[in-house]
């Protein structure tokens, strides 16, 4: 499963890019993050984001999404991360911190671009 790169906006307007695991609920792109991360603060203050996912087997095949964070949920966030870890790593999530809290950011796509160039 391909990693995504999430672009959020810093207070000065510069982008901050983070590799993330992503999910899709049929409407929203879902990003799971540990509470207190810089990307969380950026999305809370400035909900416009961009995400790009490239196919590791052909990096000229990708999907790019621009959208807005429309909801943040903590309920079920730990279980969601466990499921993401199974999909991305094939095993339980190994990096829990004591008292760790997680959030799921729901991103509503506003523009989606796909590209496929066969090598």
Task: Name the predicted role of every residue range.
Residues 2-35, 41-43, 49-53, 64:
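Short beta-strand segments
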Residues 34, 55-56, 109-110:
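Short secondary-structure boundary segments
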Residues 36-37, 90:
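Structural motif corresponding to alpha-helix initiation and N-cap regions
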Residues 60-119:
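Charged, gly/pro-rich active-site loop segments
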């Amino acid at each position: 499963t391909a990693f995504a790169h999430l672009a959020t906006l810093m207070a000065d307007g510069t982008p901050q890019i983070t590799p993330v695991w992503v999910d899709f609920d049929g409407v929203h792109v879902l990003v799971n993050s540990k509470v207190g991360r810089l990307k969380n603060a950026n999305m809370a203050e400035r909900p416009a984001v961009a995400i790009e996912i490239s196919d590791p087997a052909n990096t000229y095949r990708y999907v790019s999404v621009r959208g807005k964070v429309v909801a943040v949920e903590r309920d079920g966030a730990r279980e969601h991360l466990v499921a993401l870890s199974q999909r991305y790593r094939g095993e339980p999530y190994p990096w829990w911190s004591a008292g760790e809290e997680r959030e799921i950011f729901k991103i509503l796509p506003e523009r989606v671009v796909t590209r496929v160039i066969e090598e």
